[in-house]
């Protein structure tokens, strides 16, 4: 009987828990079927469409349960289902009173059936015949033998078949329970399937006659029921007991709605009994709700270790003998069933798409260690190992990580270089400013020092020239002290000193200075010729001058002629001007000495003529030019001078 009004109440209070399904959605699923309920359906439902009579053999025995069970099983297997039939065992003690009530109802139904047959009322015959139907033990044994020959597994429950089916789903040995009794939900089945009969096929929605509730394949999900009703499993069990079950009587006046409200308010039957109005709700004296609760929570079922589910090959010859000889089935019909059975078994071996998308579980460390040991013990194969798809993916992942790391490192290096460049620029600006300030101070000091040194050098050169002239004149006019040879030696020493001074001068003169040197040499040579002529004239005219004076003049004339030759030779030679410059300077200086000496002699002995004055003036101008040009400022130690950004002017 199950729970009174439970399916209707769930449809109203928790509609998301019930849904219509197609049989194709159960492909590849193991379905635990209540065999006693199926046999009952076959006995009352498989009838002739016109007479509603049971199928019988020659001796009058009913064979509808055999025909119906075989045809339904083959149809389920053709749709990809894997049925497991569970048979009832001994009924529980709590169900004794319920069985007595069912016996009394069956007797009344038999009496009504006789009257309907006498009257010929077909509708009443159909109605009362269903109430009088009872599945016998013999029918159960015949069904077990048929399923075994077909190779379909069966389970004999120690007690209720619904409770055993529910625990198969808990053990994950079955996907759902197929029965019409709603008490399978109270036993804890995860999914309950109703109306899994011969008419519940994939074409059920196309047939108008199948719009009736009894022919619609429905599925009830226990988890969604509890969620929709907002109850715990213990509260749901107490709620079902109050609604009415096979194990105890019910409280009069309490239906499914009242029971639900009381459970939501008091959470258990004990508190409900304490708080309800006893005058309004009569509690039965033998209300064994606690025992009923225990039978739902801990039913008598087979443990998981004792359950054996074996899919065997069908026994064709034995099956033919059982159907044809024992129960007088048509041979053609039997061969048709057997052929369908063999084809259906191939369909059940197909896997669901869900199995191809299951979540991958991680291996334990023990398994990984064992696998690595096995790999190490295996001998290495010859040849190169081809990279698998997983290896390629790993290599790509490693490359991506390396590229990301390089990109991040390059970005960091750029940022560090930028910071370093900024610091360098700041330090460089500071250092440049400091260097500029220091260079400015040093350049000012160097310019001052250079000017001072220039002035000192000019003064020294002037003093040296004066001293040389004075010494030379004294040597000329003091005949008692020095001889001609002494004068010549002194002049040679002075020339040597001048050459040393000129050698120390750096080669800082450009092309223009070299040209000026050559021009001055030409002018000086002409002047020397004139001076020599004048000196000869003066020597011939003056007879009162002593021999020493003439000797000195002659020596000077020879010296002047030698200097003239030197200057001409330097002009003709192609030697570098660096080597000629000191000689030219000495020649110019010696010529100047002779000019001064001759001028002094002329001033001392006789009046100066116009030619002599012109020569003297020319020599003084040349002397000024030479001193201005030949004695520029230049630092003594060129190596110690720092390199400047600008060129130093001489």
Swiss-Prot record:
Annotated positions binding DNA: 47, 72, 160, 244, 246
Origin, by domain of life? Eukaryota
Q: Name one GO cellular component term.
A: nucleolus
User: Which Gene3D superfamilies has this protein been placed in?
Assistant: 5' to 3' exonuclease, C-terminal subdomain, 5'-nuclease
Signal sequence, renumbered to the chain: none
Tell me the outcome of changing residue 388 to P: In strain: HN/FCC-1
Which Pfam families has this protein been placed in?
Answer: XPG_I, XPG_N
Activity regulation details: Inhibited by monovalent metal ions.
- The annotated region (I-domain) lies at 124-266
One GO BP annotation is: base-excision repair
Q: Region N-domain: what ranges?
A: 1-106
What InterPro entries has UniProt attached to this entry? 5-3_exonuclease, 5-3_exonuclease_C_sf, Flap_endonuc, HhH2, PIN-like_dom_sf, XPG-I_dom, XPG/Rad2, XPG_CS
Listed EC numbers: 3.1.-.-
| Modifications after synthesis and translation | Phosphorylated. Phosphorylation upon DNA damage induces relocalization to the nuclear plasma.
Binding of Mg(2+) 2, residues = 181, 183, 246
Q: What is its main location?
A: nucleus
Where does the record place Low complexity bias? 525-562, 582-592
UniProt biased composition (Basic and acidic residues): 413-469, 478-502, 511-524, 565-581
At which positions is Mg(2+) 1 bound? 34, 88, 160, 162
- Single GO MF annotation: 5'-3' exonuclease activity
Keyword terms, alphabetized: DNA damage, DNA repair, DNA replication, Endonuclease, Exonuclease, Hydrolase, Magnesium, Metal-binding, Mitochondrion, Nuclease, Nucleus, Phosphoprotein
Family per UniProt?
Belongs to the XPG/RAD2 endonuclease family. FEN1 subfamily.
Oligomeric state and interaction partners are given as: Interacts with PCNA1 and PCNA2. Three molecules of FEN1 bind to one PCNA trimer with each molecule binding to one PCNA monomer. PCNA stimulates the nuclease activity without altering cleavage specificity.
Q: What is this protein called?
A: Flap endonuclease 1
């Amino acid at each position: 009987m199950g729970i009174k009004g439970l399916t209707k109440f769930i449809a109203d209070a928790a509609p998301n828990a019930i849904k219509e399904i197609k049989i194709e959605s159960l492909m590849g699923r193991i379905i635990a079927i209540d065999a006693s309920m199926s046999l009952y359906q076959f006995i009352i439902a498989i009838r002739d469409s016109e007479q509603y009579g049971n199928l019988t053999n020659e001796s009058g025995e009913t064979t509808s349960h055999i025909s119906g069970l075989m045809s339904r099983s083959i149809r389920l297997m053709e749709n990809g289902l894997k049925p497991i039939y569970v048979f009832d065992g001994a009924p529980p003690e709590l169900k004794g009173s319920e069985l007595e009530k069912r016996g009394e109802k069956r007797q009344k139904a038999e009496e009504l059936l006789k009257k309907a047959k006498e009257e010929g009322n077909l509708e009443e015959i159909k109605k009362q015949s269903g109430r009088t139907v009872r599945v016998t033990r013999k029918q159960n044994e015949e069904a077990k033998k048929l399923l075994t020959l077909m190779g379909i597994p069966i389970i004999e429950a120690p007690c209720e078949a619904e409770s055993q089916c529910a625990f198969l789903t808990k053990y994950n040995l079955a996907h759902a329970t197929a029965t019409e009794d709603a008490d399978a939900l109270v036993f804890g089945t995860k999914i309950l399937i109703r109306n899994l009969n011969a008419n519940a096929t994939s074409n059920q929605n196309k047939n108008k006659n199948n719009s009736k509730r009894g022919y619609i394949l429905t599925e009830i999900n226990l988890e969604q029921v509890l969620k929709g009703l907002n109850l715990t499993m213990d509260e749901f069990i107490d709620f079902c007991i109050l609604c009415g079950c096979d194990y105890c009587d019910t409280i009069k006046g309490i239906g499914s709605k009242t029971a639900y409200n009381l459970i939501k308010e008091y959470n258990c039957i004990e508190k409900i009994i304490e708080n309800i109005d006893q005058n309004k709700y009569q509690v039965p004296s033998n209300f064994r709700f606690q025992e009923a609760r225990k039978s739902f929570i801990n039913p008598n079922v087979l443990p998981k270790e004792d359950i054996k589910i074996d899919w065997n090959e069908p026994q064709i010859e034995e099956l033919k003998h059982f159907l044809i000889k024992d129960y007088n089935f048509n041979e053609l019909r039997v061969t048709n069933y057997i052929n369908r059975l063999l084809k259906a078994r191939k369909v059940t071996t197909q896997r669901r798409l869900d199995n191809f998308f299951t979540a991958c579980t991680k291996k334990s460390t023990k398994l990984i260690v064992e696998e690595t040991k096995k790999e190490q013990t295996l001998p290495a194969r010859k040849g190169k190992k081809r990279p698998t798809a997983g290896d390629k993916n790993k290599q790509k992942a490693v490359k991506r990580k390396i590229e990301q790391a390089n990109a991040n490192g390059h970005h960091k290096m750029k940022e560090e270089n930028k910071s370093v460049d900024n610091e360098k620029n700041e330090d460089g600006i500071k250092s440049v400013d400091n260097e500029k300030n220091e260079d400015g101070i040093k350049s000012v000091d160097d310019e001052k020092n250079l000017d001072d040194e220039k002035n000192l050098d000019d003064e020294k050169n002037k003093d040296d020239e004066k001293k040389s002239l004075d010494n030379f004149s004294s040597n000329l006019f003091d005949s008692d002290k020095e001889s001609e040879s002494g004068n010549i030696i002194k002049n040679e020493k002075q020339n040597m000193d001048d050459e040393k001074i000129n050698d120390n001068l750096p080669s800082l003169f450009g092309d223009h200075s070299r040209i000026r040197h050559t021009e001055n040499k030409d002018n000086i040579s002409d002047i020397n010729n004139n001076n020599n002529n004048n000196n000869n004239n003066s020597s011939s005219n003056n007879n009162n001058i002593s021999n020493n004076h003439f000797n000195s003049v002659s020596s000077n004339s020879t010296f002047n002629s030698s200097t003239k030759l030197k200057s001409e030779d330097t002009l003709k030679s192609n030697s570098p001007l660096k080597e000629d410059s000191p000689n030219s300077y000495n020649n110019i200086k010696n010529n100047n000495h002779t000019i001064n000496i001759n001028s002094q002699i002329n001033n001392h002995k006789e009046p100066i003529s116009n030619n002599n004055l012109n020569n003297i003036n020319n020599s003084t101008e040349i002397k000024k030019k030479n001193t201005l040009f030949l004695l520029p400022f230049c630092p003594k130690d060129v190596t110690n001078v720092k390199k400047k950004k600008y060129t130093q002017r001489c």
